[in-house]
Amino acid sequence: MATQILLCFFLFFSVTLSSSGHPKNFSVELIHRDSPLSPIYNPQITVTDRLNAAFLRSVSRSRRFNHQLSQTDLQSGLIGADGEFFMSITIGTPPIKVFAIADTGSDLTWVQCKPCQQCYKENGPIFDKKKSSTYKSEPCDSRNCQALSSTERGCDESNNICKYRYSYGDQSFSKGDVATETVSIDSASGSPVSFPGTVFGCGYNNGGTFDETGSGIIGLGGGHLSLISQLGSSISKKFSYCLSHKSATTNGTSVINLGTNSIPSSLSKDSGVVSTPLVDKEPLTYYYLTLEAISVGKKKIPYTGSSYNPNDDGILSETSGNIIIDSGTTLTLLEAGFFDKFSSAVEESVTGAKRVSDPQGLLSHCFKSGSAEIGLPEITVHFTGADVRLSPINAFVKLSEDMVCLSMVPTTEVAIYGNFAQMDFLVGYDLETRTVSFQHMDCSANL
């Protein structure tokens, strides 16, 4: 069976909400778009077609990152409004359940709101701000309004209401009011956790390619207006996730752990936990690590890619933070010059198969066997202070019974450490100490 997709989202926290009465540990359930539990699941689509669609989304997402890193006009960089996971939250008083796309590449959460000027078809109820006793518009001079970029915010001066506007590269868009509201998250234990005064976008003018099963976007990036950034002290600025390669085609769901006890423990010598620093860079939405080298078997290849941070002359500078870790991107994208050396080492190390072309033309290095079993090399990723040894499912994807492809591709833009490379790891984020930890784990046992 072909290797399955499981993408997840990051959560990033800072203090903006009161943590009084909130648990220090809880879990949130996510439903993958390709899971049989997903509202957009189509049993007629083959596993191979699902994989190819995910690969194409990886390319689109990397372009979006590149635009946001290299342009000041963020609207031109928002490419694609689809996502890999749906997340359920409730909003307002009385509460209305909304089912929205979880997106690590966005900060402000927005949902469709009545009264609509233009709203796309939605299967569930649309949030009506007039029926909620806890809805409150944000004034134009508020800190939360000013946290939006100049291209994303506006002002209704006659009513002193802050406005947001998001325009995506696939012609999707959302416009509306910035407001605060009570948001509740259904934890995996079954008990909802409520956060009053959460900043969000109340979208009354929305259209494009949004799926009718979703109410909007849940912003899970690292910026100040991210839903998760607003929860900060409520979960001690710690979270972890475990991505299982099985859950995209089973009735299992993905669970992200939030709070003090969510981080991999390194107290035991046999824990296998390794940690690497998070690098602080703009824009805050993304999570930057420093990649030093990748080993293929015993051959260690120094990473030659620059961090995508052009200086005033448009020249890339050799600094730390040269790769973004992102669970919303399926593939791993590596600097083209380095990739040539790395992929050559992989090709030399594969046994029992010959190199062939990917039938879809999406992956650069595929290998096909006759009747023999394909021998794949061990690959180790060397981040600063952390050597992460990958399993075959982390570096290769099985497209058929006799063909596998390297799930890493070259790029001339921003490097991304993608979802496949993170499967069956407990990946922990300690945003107080600014570290990311990795620990091998059977994630299917933790769903």
From Swiss-Prot:
InterPro entries per the UniProt record, alphabetical: Aspartic_peptidase_AS, Pepsin-like_plant, PEPTIDASE_A1, Peptidase_aspartic_dom_sf, Plant_Aspart_Prot_A1, TAXi_C, TAXi_N
Signal sequence interval, chain numbering: 1-20
A cellular component term, taken from the record's GO annotations: extracellular region
Cell compartments where the protein resides: Secreted
UniProt xrefs under Gene3D superfamilies: Acid Proteases
Keyword Protease: yes
Gene ablation phenotype (knockout): No visible phenotype.
Record key words, sorted: Aspartyl protease, Glycoprotein, Hydrolase, Protease, Repeat, Secreted, Signal
List of catalytic residues: 103, 326
CDD domains: pepsin_A_like_plant
GO terms under biological process: pollen tube guidance; proteolysis
Alphabetized GO MF terms: aspartic-type endopeptidase activity; endopeptidase activity
Segments forming domain Peptidase A1: 85-439
EC number: 3.4.-.-
Stated family: Belongs to the peptidase A1 family.
The protein's name: Probable aspartic protease At2g35615
